[in-house]
Regions:
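Mixed-charge, glycine-accented linear interaction segment located at domain edges/termini
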Residues: 120-159
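Acidic-enriched, low-complexity/disordered segments with a strong bias for Aspartate over Glutamate
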Residues: 38-41, 89, 107, 153
């Protein structure tokens, strides 16, 4: 069974509606997903952090991680904002992508942050920052269909 099917099955087993934080894990074909949910209903879910790990990228160097980041930039066009690489750190072997441009209103900026890291780890979170404040993690609200597509894209790019 594919990782997407594993996640879909796990989502279908969760009680709905639920606004209780819960962690969903799934594994298939050398890929592991941990999804930190803060809400689930029949149509959508909210997650604070999506963590993905791929054995195929376990020994990847910075150049291969940059290629993964570029592929994700091209595929993840359905998020609230487009994402693009903003920084890479060869010493720590990590590529950072963010919403470009972020979502802004009068007193708040919100954006996605995607890290492609050593060991085949990818993580996606959404942050918000009030004017004059520090950034805080916030929930990413997506339909179940978009969540499964996102996981499928991570799995495809990281294989």
């Amino acid at each position: 069974m594919s990782l997407v099917h594993e996640v879909q099955s796990a989502l279908n087993r969760l009680p709905i509606p639920s606004h209780t934080p819960q962690t969903l894990t799934a594994e298939a074909a050398g890929q592991h997903l941990t999804l930190h949910l803060d809400g689930v209903d029949s149509l959508a879910c909210g997650f604070v952090l999506l963590e993905f790990e791929s054995q195929a990228l376990a020994s990847a160097g910075i150049e291969q991680l940059k290629q993964v980041a570029e592929k994700l930039e091209k595929r993840l066009t359905y998020l609230l904002e487009p994402i693009s690489p903003i920084e890479h750190d060869a010493e720590h072997c990590v590529v950072q992508l963010r919403s470009n441009p972020p979502q802004r209103n009068e007193d708040r900026t919100s954006y996605y942050e995607l890290l492609v890291s050593r060991g085949g780890r990818l993580s996606l979170a959404r942050y918000a920052k009030q004017v004059g404040g520090v950034r805080q993690p916030v929930s990413s609200h997506v339909t179940r269909e978009v969540l499964l597509r996102l996981i499928g894209d991570f799995a495809q790019v990281a294989s």
